[in-house]
Structure formats: structure tokens, C-alpha cells
Regions:
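PP2C/PPM-type serine/threonine phosphatase catalytic domain
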Residues: 1-305
Length: 305
């Protein structure tokens, strides 16, 4: 595989940044993911980090160096992250469960597969056209697609999500794929801090007209400017697909990797490759969360410095 990646996360006017993102890959498959911890619930930064760690751990365990069923993997790994959040809340005796949205894209062969829960989005741009976008799990999006079937009153809060990881009910996970990729196709994963103040057409224009190293920072800065002093955190992870074989001209090429090689930018945890996250004992969960909290503390101290 050959691809290039650029990612930026900026704290807006919120007390802390609860967005997390990263990617990992083997010789023949790549996983890109972003999660947005939800405000109004405890420890959103733990929720987003734990969801990504679970996803990455299962990818490392199962991808040898490909996955037999990418869509099934995405669905099961995202639901496993949900179960981890419920177990964490029980272990900590929390009154409420930490919650997060998530969007993840898997590249395998020459095809893309993706899944999401909540309102973190994926955009796919080919040339200067928006080819695909995820649909938010919000009542606003639901009204747009089902307005004739499910009318909603004016007082209804359309921005409320009807599903996320960590919620009491089973999460809704939408999956898409396979979608055959062409060289030059670009995928963008983002939190609602971006699309909440920057339109789909603006995202498409920037992504199609500039290199990722220019378009991603500009989109983030535009979102912060448009959002003002109380704007949400803005996180963006973008990937440009170059193809399956050959040398990468801009970023990462995996063809020379061994079958057992696994690389990741997602913070490592105690989630072993030979253990299902749903089968971890309480001591392992405790150690995992301790690692997360220590990393968050170090990150906070670094930003203050």
C-alpha cells in the first residue's frame, strides 16, 4: 500500500480537548480512526482513547496481514469499545458512563471500508467531487432523511445524538464498503468541530485543491475562526491514497514490510493481541485506564508548559 497522512487536533474554547485520533497498519491493510469524547458526561477523553485503543488492539490481533471480513471487523471492534466503556464505568462505580463518537476507515487491497457511530464524519473526495459522506446519528440528520415519515416538532433538539459508544442502549454502527479507490482519492475523518462551522463544499474545495499538508491546517484554522472564542475542539485526520504497489512519492509505503509487522500511532495499552478486549479482567482494565490517565496528565502538563 502507498498513502500519505496528515492530522491536526486543536483545542477550541472548551476546558479540554477530548478528541483522539490515529492510524495503524500492516503490510496489506491500514486502519484510520477518530473519536470525540462527549461533553456532559464524565471522562470524555478516556472514552475516546479507550475506544481507539480497543480498535487498534483488535486490528493488531486479527490482521495477519489482512482481515477476512473488513466490515464485520469494524462493527465488532467498535461494539467492543462500547463494552469496554460500560465495564470501565462499572469498575469505577461511575453514576454515568463516559461516552464518545467514533469514525473508522479500513484500507485493504485497493478498497476502502468505513464505519461510524455518532456524528464524527468521514468525507471521500475524488478529483473535485465529494463522492461520499457519513450520515450523522442525530435527530437533525434523521429528520432530513425521514421528514415525511417521522415529523418532528419545532421544540425538538435536532442536534442531539440518538446513539454513541457508552450509551445505555446498544450502539448503532453504520458500515459502508467496499469502495474501490483510485490514486489521488482523499479521505478525511473529522470531529464535529470542523463540519459544525465549515460547510461540506468548503471542505471539498480545500481538500481537492491543496496538498494535505496545506489543506488540513487551513480547514482547522478556518473552523476555529468561524467558531469564535467558544468554538469546539477541531480534529482532522486526512489520507491520500496512492495505490497498492510501488514506491510512495509523499508518505508511507508498506510493500516491504514483513507479514508480522504492525505499526501504530495510537497509544499502546495492555490490550494484548492474543486477548479479546471483551475478555480482559478488571486488573488489566485498571492498568489500561491508568496508562490513559497518565498520558492525558502528561499531555496537559506539556501544553501548559
Amino acid at each position: 500500500m502507498r498513502f500519505s497522512v496528515y492530522q491536526v487536533s486543536r483545542k477550541g474554547g472548551r476546558e479540554k480537548n477530548e478528541d483522539r485520533m490515529g492510524y495503524c497498519y500492516t503490510r496489506d491493510a491500514g486502519l484510520f480512526a477518530l473519536a470525540d469524547g462527549m461533553g456532559g458526561h464524565p471522562e470524555g477523553e478516556v472514552a475516546s482513547q479507550l475506544a481507539l485503543q480497543t480498535l487498534a488492539a483488535m486490528f493488531q490481533r486479527d490482521c495477519k496481514p489482512t482481515l477476512p471480513d473488513p466490515l464485520r471487523f469494524l462493527h465488532e471492534a467498535i461494539v467492543a469499545g462500547h463494552h469496554q466503556l460500560l465495564r470501565y464505568a462499572t469498575q469505577k462505580a461511575l453514576i454515568d458512563t463516559p461516552r464518545t463518537t467514533i469514525v473508522a476507515c479500513l484500507m485493504q487491497g485497493n478498497a476502502a471500508y468505513w464505519a461510524h457511530c455518532g456524528d464524527s464524519r468521514l468525507y471521500m473526495v475524488r478529483g473535485d467531487k465529494l463522492v461520499a459522506r457519513t450520515r450523522d446519528h442525530s435527530y437533525s440528520e434523521l429528520q432530513q432523511t425521514m421528514s415525511q415519515v417521522v415529523p418532528m416538532g419545532d421544540r425538538f433538539n435536532r442536534n442531539v445524538l440518538f446513539t454513541c459508544l457508552g450509551s445505555p442502549g446498544k450502539p448503532v454502527v453504520d458500515t459502508v464498503g467496499p469502495l474501490l479507490m483510485q490514486a489521488g482519492d482523499r479521505l478525511l475523518l473529522c470531529s464535529d468541530g470542523l463540519w459544525g462551522t465549515v460547510s461540506d463544499s468548503e471542505i471539498t474545495d480545500q481538500l481537492s485543491s491543496l496538498p494535505l499538508s496545506d489543506s488540513v491546517p487551513e480547514l482547522v484554522e478556518q473552523a476555529l475562526r468561524n467558531g469564535g472564542p467558544k468554538c469546539d475542539n477541531v480534529s482532522v485526520l486526512a489520507m491520500e491514497w496512492e495505490g497498492v504497489e510501488g514506491d510512495s512519492t509523499m508518505g508511507i509505503q508498506t510493500t516491504s514490510l514483513g507479514e508480522a509487522v504492525f505499526a501504530s500511532t495510537i497509544q499502546a495499552s495492555v490490550l494484548g493481541t492474543d486477548v479479546s478486549p471483551d475478555e480482559l479482567d478488571d486488573a488489566e482494565i485498571e492498568r489500561s485506564i491508568k496508562e490513559i490517565n497518565e498520558a492525558i496528565k502528561r499531555s496537559s502538563q506539556h501544553k501548559k508548559g
